[in-house]
Amino acid sequence: MSRSALLASLLVFTAAAGAQQQAAQPARPVAARPAPQQQKLTPEQQAQVTRQDAEITKAAAKVVQLVDTSKTGEVWDGASKVAKNLVNRQTFVSQISADRKKLGAPAERKRVAVTRSAYTAGGQVPAGNYINVVYATKFANAPQPVRELVSFHLDDDKTWRVSGYSLR
């Protein structure tokens, strides 16, 4: 991923989720290798994952709604420090606005996945725990659906905040 794509994809919005819920989440390894077998979750852990997915999905819907209504600056205002350390508000807003202008208005959006990742220091992505909400979105000026991604980072205060928004 190019630095500009990474910068454009980093942003934050508060989502409700507790640290104990994150502790129950299996994380994906950073390296591009097959994931180790995931541990079997207890029914209580699975219920926590399901609740967290619903909360994060609601938060992601708010983010895309703000982007859809040209309120991208508000997304940046609530972003994680991880995102704010990589891109300033003006760059974030102008990059997303330019990308969305090319695509036109969203016509249909379907959530296709909620994924979890953990990154260690020294990589292309800042260290930490992330949850991503992936949409297949049809836009007025795009013949095929576009992958729309909203990422959240678990900040030091144990609050999930938007760490990215990207289109591919």
Predicted segments, located by residue:
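Exposed beta-sheet edge and beta->alpha loop/turn motif
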Residues: 115-168
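Acidic, low-complexity intrinsically disordered segments
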Residues: 51, 58, 62, 66, ...
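N-terminal signal peptide c-region/cleavage motif recognized by signal peptidases
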Residues: 14-16
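Short, low-complexity N-terminal intrinsically disordered segments enriched in polar/charged residues
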Residues: 20-69
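Bacterial N-terminal signal peptides that target proteins for export
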Residues: 1-7
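Short solvent-exposed beta->alpha transition segments
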Residues: 57-58, 73-130
